[in-house]
Regions:
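Gly/Pro-rich hinge or "lid" segments in bacterial periplasmic/extracellular proteins
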Residues: 70-75, 161-213, 217, 225-227, ...
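Alpha-helical secondary-structure segments
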Residues: 108-115, 143-147, 187-188, 215-217, ...
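Ligand-site clamp/hinge motif
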Residues: 92, 205-251, 379
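Detector for C-terminal structural segments
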Residues: 8, 15, 195, 261, ...
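A structural "hinge/loop" feature
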Residues: 40-56, 79-80, 105, 127-128, ...
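Aromatic- and charge-enriched surface segment that lines or borders ligand/interaction sites
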Residues: 82-125, 141, 147, 229-232, ...
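N-terminal lobe/hinge region of extracytoplasmic solute-binding protein
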Residues: 37-89, 117, 184-185
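Surface-exposed binding/hinge segments that line
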Residues: 85, 90, 129-171
Length: 504
């Protein structure tokens, strides 16, 4: 899509006459404000009604988790938690002292228990409930201690706690159902406003317990069109954008205002089957689909070779990856043979769903996938849906999309994928059910010995590939464009954090 300067100015709500005021400081980010144009910004004011890494980054400006993964250390570090212990079917956490919410109330264990209760409230719109399905009780013996009691030893519980943000119970008791209209957390920024559709504004918390951020105001604007984000960056309307198209990198590197940063991403892209729909309940058809898709060719032809094909059910850097496993080779003739065996000698009609603009070149990817699958004997109808609708149908309680293109962000442990997509009853994303696989996944979840747990994950991965439960594709490089005078800390998890930024 080509977009003119005048078209862009119209899109952002000003006429051409307003351009000079807009652009007069366009070649340098403000020292007080950073404006971020992002393809994925929260679609709901409820911070628990999401399950997406970049959106977690939005909310983390104002509220914080107990722990988070340090990607450099490849281990968990405390945020609100000072320490933690694994005690059989219990996890005991000690909270840091002298932390206050934005309303002045001190952080206590009661706030943690209150927030977990909100996260488990599926009827209230939370998508976080599956993370606590194995928790039977949350105990608060004193203000600084939280104990999670689980059905059985749960060695992987720390992974479940990442991105689980804590809100103020005092605010919850005061505002009730209106709590999310002005969420109160402990984070480095305070909530200012939210506009439905994906515009958020945060202002600095000058009394933040972890030290004052350099940037005073952070603005997120949801812009799904690549061309619109690029125009905003080049004009100075935006200081930072995500999902820079790879074919634009060389040109933008010559731009006087723009710098390009790249990092290997943790988001794994794949095509998911929903076994509640025919023909995906047929293993032969799923295998045929795997033989029909050429991921390396997609990386080469669409992403200019900037990508990392996945050769098993998870990428090589994920805990539990098995280098012995290989992806299905591209073999359209083999696909046709399998379809004939499955009862489709004249081809098979399918629908492929995606959300245009959510991921880099997602429309082009799905068009190429459809063309590849036609050669394998499939007749593919492409259907694009706005992200909120797509997510509602695909997400935790969805189960309404038969076949879809999706990216799983911040995938560091194979358990996350196996549990959320292939364990019976965890979610409705694929409606796959295999008691033998369930047993292996559940066994590794309670195995504290990491070597033994990885061996179990590899057994599960082998079964997943044999059953052709989905089509693993690739990891991509996350490509960002930003003002040259903006310094930030790059992360592989797609979070864009204002307190990691400063102006030079």
């Amino acid at each position: 899509m080509a977009i003119s300067r005048r078209q862009f100015l119209t899109m952002v709500g000003i006429g051409a006459a307003g351009a000079p005021a807009l652009l007069r400081n366009g070649y340098a980010a403000s020292r007080d404000r950073v404006t971020i144009y992002h393809s994925s910004v929260a679609d709901s004011i409820n911070p628990y009604n999401h399950s997406s890494s970049p959106i977690y980054g939005d909310w983390q400006h104002i509220m914080e988790p107990l722990i988070e993964l340090d990607y450099a250390k490849k281990d968990y570090v405390g945020v609100l938690a000072e320490s933690w212990q694994f005690q059989g079917n219990k996890w005991l956490f000690k909270l840091k002292k002298n932390i206050k919410f934005h309303n002045g109330a001190p952080l206590t264990s009661k706030d943690v228990a209150f927030s977990i209760e909100k996260m488990r409230d599926e009827k209230g719109g939370s998508l976080q409930a599956p993370n606590f399905k194995d928790v039977t009780e949350v105990q608060t013996p004193d203000d600084q201690t939280v104990i999670f009691v689980t059905k059985q030893p749960l060695a992987i519980f720390l992974d479940r706690l990442e991105n689980r943000f804590i809100l103020s119970k005092v605010a919850g008791d005061k505002f009730g159902d209106k709590l999310y209209d002005n969420p109160i957390g402990t984070g480095p920024y305070k909530f200012v406003s939210y506009q439905r559709g994906g515009n958020m504004v945060f202002t600095r918390n000058d009394e933040y317990w972890g030290g004052k951020a350099a940037i005073k105001e952070v603005i997120f604007r949801k812009v799904t069109e690549d061309a619109a984000r690029l125009a905003a960056l080049e004009s100075g309307q935006a200081d930072f954008i995500n999902n820079v198209p790879d074919h634009e990198v060389a040109r933008l590197q010559k731009h006087p205002r723009v710098r390009i940063d790249k990092v290997e991403g943790l988001r794994m892209f794949f095509l998911a089957f929903n076994m509640a729909f025919k023909p995906w309940d047929n293993k032969l058809v799923r295998q045929a689909a795997n033989y029909s898709v050429d991921a390396p060719a997609i990386i080469k032809n669409i992403f200019d070779g900037i990508g990392y094909p996945i050769n098993g059910p998870v990428g090589a850097n994920v805990i539990g990856a098995d280098p012995a496993l290989k992806r299905y080779p591209y073999d359209p003739q083999k696909a046709k043979q399998l379809l004939a065996q499955a009862g489709f000698p004249n081809g098979c009609d399918i629908q492929l769903y995606y959300s245009a603009g959510r991921y880099p070149k997602d429309k082009e990817v799905c068009q190429v996938v459809a063309a590849q699958m036609v050669k394998g004997g499939f007749n593919v109808e492409l259907i694009s849906q706005e992200w909120a609708l797509f997510w509602d149908k695909q997400g935790v309680n969805g189960g309404k999309l038969p076949f879809y293109y999706i990216g799983r962000g911040s995938l560091t442990d194979a358990d996350t994928l196996y549990d959320q997509y292939f364990r019976t009853g965890t979610t409705k994303r694929t409606n796959y059910s295999n008691p033998e696989l369930d047993k292996i996944v559940e066994e590794q979840q309670k195995t504290p010995d990491q070597k033994k747990r990885i061996a179990l994950l590899r057994r599960a991965g082998k079964m997943i590939m044999e059953e052709a439960t989905f089509i693993p594709l690739y990891n991509l490089a996350d490509i960002y464009g930003l003002a040259r005078n903006l310094i930030w800390k790059m992360r592989p998890d797609e979070k864009v954090l204002g307190w990691d930024m400063k102006i030079k």
